[in-house]
A protein has these predicted regions:
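Conserved alpha-helical substructure of the radical SAM core
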Residues: 1-110
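A generic "binding-loop/recognition-motif" signal
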Residues: 18, 118-119
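Alpha-helical elements of the RecA-like P-loop NTPase motor core of helicases
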Residues: 23, 97, 121-124, 134
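A short acidic, helix-capping loop that chelates divalent metal ions and anchors anionic groups
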Residues: 29-33, 119-127
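Gly/Ser/Thr-rich beta-alpha loop segments that engage phosphate groups in nucleotides
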Residues: 64-65, 113, 119, 130
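Histidine-centered beta-alpha loop that forms part of the nucleotide-sugar donor binding/catalytic region
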Residues: 90-92, 115-118
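Glycine-rich S-adenosyl-L-methionine
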Residues: 128-140
């Protein structure tokens, strides 16, 4: 393995906060933000350092990135420094048409939402909250 190569992909778990209770969650999701999360200024500095590695794809994930009030500032800065920027929000009531418009306005390359089953009972059981299948489907 050549550790002098630049990363192709950087995934930043910007928060552990999330309103879902997914059975597979690796983020140890909780309802509130952790006070150890990077500040907006620290996040901007991190993005600049990541860009100095080369041209990796940057993915903002969580928890739910929409639980961070400054997520759109971080996304805009990521695009501004020249990173190919993606976001993976949770399918919760925070994922509104206005939020999706804000993502577009930030200039992100891609947004992904998970579907964890062919129907609402399967998906919602996996996500731990009723109604998330319908939210995800409505944003197609």
């Amino acid at each position: 393995m050549d550790f002098n190569q630049s990363p192709l992909l950087v995934i930043w778990e910007v928060t552990q906060a999330c309103d879902l209770a997914c059975v597979h969650c690796r983020a140890s999701a909780q309802s509130r933000r952790d006070n150890r999360e990077l500040s907006l200024d620290e996040g901007r500095q991190l993005l600049e350092e990541i860009k100095s590695f080369g041209d990796p794809m940057m993915v903002f994930t969580g928890g739910d990135p929409l639980k961070r009030p400054d997520i759109f500032d971080l996304l805009r800065h990521s695009v501004k420094v020249g990173l190919r920027t993606n976001v993976t929000p949770s399918a919760t009531p925070l994922l509104t048409p206005a939020a999706i418009s804000h993502f577009q306005d930030c200039g992100i390359s891609r947004m992904a939402i998970s579907l964890d089953g062919p129907d609402a009972p399967t998906h919602d059981s996996f996500r731990g909250v009723r109604g998330t299948f319908d939210t995800a489907e409505s944003e197609r």
